[in-house]
Structures are given as structure tokens and as C-alpha cells.
Amino acid sequence: MSQVTKRALEQSLKNLLLKKPLTKITVGDIADDCGINRMTFYYHFKDIYDLVEWSCLEDAKRALDEKKTYETWQQGLLQIFEAVQENKPFILNVYRCVHREQVEKYLRPLVDRLLLDVIDEEAGGMTIRAEDKQFVAQVYSYIFIGLMLDWIKDDMREDPRQIVDRLARMIKGSMAAALLRFKL
């Protein structure tokens, strides 16, 4: 029942974002739209931004599913772009109402989930310290998130496939090369 309520709250927030900016939406608005009381909202989330973050993480889980290997990372990243695009009014509203850093905070778990699995696979039989793997993941995460934030800022006009294809061409082989440099 808890997941059902959370999904209903998420849908209410997304409905409200079609009508007004995030900064003008209250917990009461969401509760009214959802047909629950405010305390039920607070049972599940500490504030609206907590709901936004949860929504982004849930979208990431659905988008990535099993697309977290070296062979499928492009498909996984494309699915993140597509999930963001499917929620365009929601994402653009959040992007315009909060600082870029906040949107980055929402995107980071999506991208990190993808990258860490890919890096673990690429590291294969290599002995590499965990903090070095994390560092490599962080560098790629900045690239991926930076591209996505610029795409969002530009109103998601460019075809995500082109972005992912160009990125794949540019970084092909670089992750394995970076990991080799950290090999013990």
C-alpha cells in the first residue's frame, strides 16, 4: 500500500507541475489533488523535494532495469535521457525552480547506478582500489550529467540518440584505459 500511495503522490505532483511552478506547489496542494491528508504525505516524504528525489530514483530504476553493463551502457544512458524526456514538464519545471546543483543531485544516483556496474565489469580481473574505481566513476558521471544538464537547459531539443552516439564514439576504450592506469 505504501508504494501505491507514493506513486499517487508522485502523479499528483506531476499533474500540478503542468499547471504551476514547483515553488508555488504546497504539500496541501499535493494532498488535496491526491485525496489524502497532509499527514499521510509526511508519513512518506519529509518535503516536496524529497518526493521529487524519490520520483527521479524510481524513474531511474525503471529506465535502467538491466542496462548496466559495458555492452549496454549506451542503451542505459539513452533510457535515462528518454525517462527525463517522458517527464519533460516535470523535469523542466524542477530545473527552472531549483538550482542546477539540485537537479544534478537528482540525476547523480541515476548515472552513478549505471556507471558503477559498468566500471566493476570493465575492471574485471584487475586489482583496483575501491576509491580509484569511485574516482573513475565520478569523472564519467560529471561528463554524463553535464551533457544531460545542458540538454535540459536547451529545452531537450537535441535528439538523445545523437548525444549518446557522439559520447560513445568519444569515450570508446577510455574507461578501460583509465582503469588500467589505476591497476595495482
Regions of interest found by a model, annotated:
Residues 100-125, 131-146, 176:
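Amphipathic alpha-helical packing segments from all-alpha helical-bundle domains
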Residues 3-6, 10-14, 18, 23-27, ...:
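An amphipathic alpha-helix adjacent to DNA-recognition modules
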Residues 25-26, 92-94, 103, 160:
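Short, hydrophobic secondary-structure boundary micro-motifs
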Residues 74-89, 138, 142, 146, ...:
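Amphipathic alpha-helical segments that line or abut small-molecule/effector binding pockets
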Residues 116-117, 127-135, 153, 160-163, ...:
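Protein-protein interaction and targeting regions used for scaffolding, dimerization, and localization
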Residues 150-184:
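C-terminal peripheral helix-coil segments that are non-catalytic and often amphipathic
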Residues 40, 90:
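Residues in the helix-turn-helix
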Residues 67, 91-95, 122-125, 151-155, ...:
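Secondary-structure edge/capping motif, primarily at the C-terminal ends of alpha-helices
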